[in-house]
């Protein structure tokens, strides 16, 4: 049975992309191509950028291209792994989120603290500060290395609108190679039919340009849409497997054309089972390989789509499978939608399909949502253990986690442990979370430290990020203490303490009596090495974007560059550039990518340039400056224009109603637009609101942070359920872990660790105070 293809490590993905593209240059570019790398003959460079046609003059194809760019921006589609936090996009299969954060903010603030996050970047569409410029007067000098920012923004905007020919004409007026390379990269990113040959030519001409997964995706899409020859397709994939649905389909067609029927069939089955794509490509696959896919393949695709709430794909797959599978889709959707007809839909599933994984999952979720976790646990106990039958073990784990926590709330630790431990999570981050939950329940509620130690050891064997490494070691120490192994416990705490920027690393340091918080930084890149770094086209392009104020487009290039770099000194230099460009969001991204790989870029990961100076309001209790930085980093990554789907705005992600109440409390005028246009105004109101929360919760940092994220009403419920962490008889570490909203649980830990680091960044004399912070407001 075909299993989902394993993805390449991020550190290798871009190099494989470049190798695959360059390896095919001899085939793809056997004929001559234009100087700019286009498929069409190149036109002589113009002395000045050519005036673009008006939008009204666009062809139908160009209009469609522009509309498609707005609907599905390739930048927003990039999954950027920046933080061991998983951004869940919905209700987490029943666990209600505290609130909805902006796409970028959710990368840090939501869900699982061990998952590499899918970090969708903000839309990189750039609106020029002025109308797209006309051709300069012929008497003016041609654009030189000092690229005109307005003209650069104009050319970028043309590519973003799908006006490739107009963009090319403007690009040809630039003489700076960095500007030309930047604009070609923008054209490829925009996905406006640039073509395979042009994409390959760009990589050939710029072998050191941070490639990223998008260049590969664009090339694979073009291989299929341009119907490239089997020889070219196979040459392209000689060094790297396909990473997209179009790429897999193109390779399957090429394999079959060359007589490799078995390999082609295997590729089609892998495509069908592991990739998400729409009706059009589905029809092409079925038309090209009518006898390859079986009912088992269709059922697998249906199950995967159901677990992703992709009802249309699931319905089509059920139709291909035949039988009564459509009833499973109806039942699954009714349960997920919390329909009043869910029970009837489940009852309508034929008895022959009630052993199907999808039915078991839906039945368990229905019972759990009906506040019957014991019955849900009994149903989960009948679930198959074969990962290929479960299809997506991670989604199954999420349901198990929610049921286990509900059972724990009922005091049934034994069953909660059974539900948590009998899991089949697939990805490392979910396996870490599952093993942690099983170990934590065993240690703190089921009285079985020996079993807990085994689970925490499994976490340690998988963990790579500082947060996960520290969490594993800290809890190994707690288990060892419970077993009476004091020396072993100390060794585990010392291991956790080696991660000083992670929450559990800081808690371990406090437990060991360590009061320092050492932040690491590499040596500077100097001399000829620094000159060579600064001279790279991609680095010069980043400077051009920064000087033109195009931060939205600079961010993905910073991230691609940070992924490609392995020398800490070069990463430090990249961060220095982001600092020069006053781009704290890029600094956070660069720093996180570095520290996730164990590289010493702690300071860059916690920038101090993101908040302008301001005078605080005196009508509310004051909070320390480090706390404002800790919150802003978690809420918006210092993006002053950030807006969430539910309306939270600005640097501090304040809801307008909350901001208005706070403004009234401090007797200042309220202007909702200033939340996103005036970062100092938003920071002042955010700090004032934090002061209000400190007052509400009598100085408790834990309760204030939880309330900032989830609201005071939820915090009151959690105090009723789990006790008051301000009282001495409640273990505050456990209290935070018992927060039922995964987003808020993670949020409190991340803000608490941010606070410790920012104290050190803003005042190097500051001692580690996390133990006191966790117990503030104690009575």
PLM regions with names:
Residues 137-145, 168-178, 188-192, 201-211, ...:
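Solenoid-like repeat scaffolds
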Residues 154, 184-187, 219, 251, ...:
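Structural register within alpha-helical repeat arrays
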Residues 161, 226-227, 258, 308, ...:
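Structural motif corresponding to the intra-repeat A-B loop/turn of tetratricopeptide repeats
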Residues 158, 223, 255, 305, ...:
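Residue at a conserved register position within TPR or TPR-like alpha-solenoid repeats
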Residues 185-187, 200-201, 205, 372-375, ...:
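Catalytic glycan-binding domains that act on GlcNAc-containing polysaccharides
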Residues 33-150:
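Compositionally biased, proline/threonine/alanine/serine-rich low-complexity intrinsically disordered stretches
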Residues 151, 179-180, 184, 216, ...:
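TPR repeat positional signature
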């Amino acid at each position: 049975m075909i299993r989902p293809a394993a993805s390449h490590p991020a550190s290798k993905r871009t190099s494989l992309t470049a190798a695959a593209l360059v390896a095919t240059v001899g085939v793809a570019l056997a004929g001559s191509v234009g100087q700019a790398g286009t498929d069409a003959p190149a036109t002589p460079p113009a002395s000045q950028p050519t005036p673009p046609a008006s939008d009204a003059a666009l062809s139908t194809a160009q209009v469609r291209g522009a509309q498609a760019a707005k609907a599905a921006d390739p930048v927003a589609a990039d999954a950027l792994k920046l933080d061991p936090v998983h951004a869940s996009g919905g209700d987490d299969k029943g666990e209600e989120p505290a609130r909805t954060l902006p796409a970028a903010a959710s990368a840090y603030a939501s869900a699982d603290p061990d998952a590499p996050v899918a970090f969708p970047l903000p839309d990189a569409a750039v609106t020029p500060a002025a109308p797209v410029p006309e051709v300069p007067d012929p008497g003016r000098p041609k654009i030189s290395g000092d690229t005109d920012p307005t003209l650069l923004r104009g050319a970028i905007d043309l590519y973003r609108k799908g006006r490739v020919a107009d963009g090319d004409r403007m690009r040809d007026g630039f003489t700076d190679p960095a500007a030309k390379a930047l604009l070609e990269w923008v054209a490829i990113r925009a996905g406006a039919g640039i073509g395979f040959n042009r994409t390959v030519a760009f990589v050939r001409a710029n072998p050191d340009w941070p490639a990223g997964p998008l260049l590969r995706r664009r090339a694979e899409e073009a291989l299929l849409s341009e119907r490239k020859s089997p020889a070219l397709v196979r040459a392209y994939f000689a060094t790297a497997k396909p990473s997209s649905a179009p790429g897999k389909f193109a390779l399957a067609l090429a394999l079959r054309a060359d007589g490799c029927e078995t390999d082609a069939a295997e590729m089609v089955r892998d495509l069908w089972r592991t990739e998400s794509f729409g009706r059009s490509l589905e029809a092409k696959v079925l038309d090209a390989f009518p006898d390859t896919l079986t009912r088992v393949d269709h059922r697998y695709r249906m199950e995967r789509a159901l677990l992703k709430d992709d009802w249309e794909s699931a319905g089509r797959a059920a139709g291909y499978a035949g039988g009564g599978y459509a009833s499973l889709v109806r039942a699954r959707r009714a349960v997920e939608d919390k329909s009043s007809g869910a029970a009837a839909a489940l009852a309508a599933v034929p008895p022959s399909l009630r052993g199907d994984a999808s039915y078991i999952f839906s039945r368990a979720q229905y019972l759990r949502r009906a506040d019957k976790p014991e019955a849900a646990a009994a149903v989960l106990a009948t679930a198959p253990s074969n990962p290929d039958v479960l299809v997506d073990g991670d989604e199954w784990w999420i349901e198990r986690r929610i049921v286990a926590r509900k059972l724990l709330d009922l005091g049934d630790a034994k069953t909660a442990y059974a539900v948590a431990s009998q899991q089949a999570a697939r990805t490392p981050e979910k396996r870490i979370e599952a093993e942690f939950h099983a170990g934590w329940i065993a240690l703190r509620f089921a009285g079985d430290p020996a079993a807990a130690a085994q689970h925490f050891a499994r976490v340690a064997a998988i963990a790579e990020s500082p947060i996960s490494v520290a969490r594993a070691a800290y809890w190994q120490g707690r288990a060892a203490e419970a077993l009476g192994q004091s020396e072993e416990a100390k060794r585990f705490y010392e291991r956790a303490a080696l991660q000083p920027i992670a929450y559990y690393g800081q808690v371990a340091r406090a437990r060991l009596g360590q009061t320092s918080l050492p932040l690491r930084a590499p040596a500077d890149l100097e001399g000829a090495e620094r000159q060579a770094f600064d001279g790279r086209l991609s680095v010069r392009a980043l400077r051009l974007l920064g000087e033109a104020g195009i931060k939205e487009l600079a961010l993905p290039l910073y991230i691609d560059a940070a992924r490609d770099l392995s020398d800490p000194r070069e990463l430090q230099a990249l961060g220095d550039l982001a600092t020069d460009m006053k781009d704290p969001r890029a600094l956070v991204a660069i720093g996180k990518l570095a520290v996730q790989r164990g590289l010493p870029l702690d300071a860059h990961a916690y920038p101090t340039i993101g908040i302008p100076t301001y005078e605080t309001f005196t009508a509310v209790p004051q909070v320390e400056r480090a706390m404002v930085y800790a919150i802003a980093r978690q809420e918006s990554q210092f993006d002053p224009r950030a807006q969430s789907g539910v309306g939270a705005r600005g640097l501090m992600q304040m809801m307008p109603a909350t901001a208005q109440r706070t403004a009234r409390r401090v007797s200042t005028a309220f202007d909702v637009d200033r939340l996103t246009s005036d970062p100092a105004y938003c920071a002042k109101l955010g700090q004032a609101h934090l002061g209000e929360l400190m007052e509400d919760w009598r100085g408790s940092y834990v309760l204030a942070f939880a309330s900032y994220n989830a609201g005071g009403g939820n915090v009151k419920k959690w105090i009723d359920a789990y006790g008051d962490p301000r009282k001495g008889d409640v273990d505050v570490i456990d209290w935070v872990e018992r927060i039922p909203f995964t987003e808020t649980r993670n949020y409190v830990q991340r803000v608490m660790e941010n606070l410790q680091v920012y104290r050190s960044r803003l005042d190097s004399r500051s001692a580690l105070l996390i133990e006191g912070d966790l117990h503030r407001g104690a009575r």
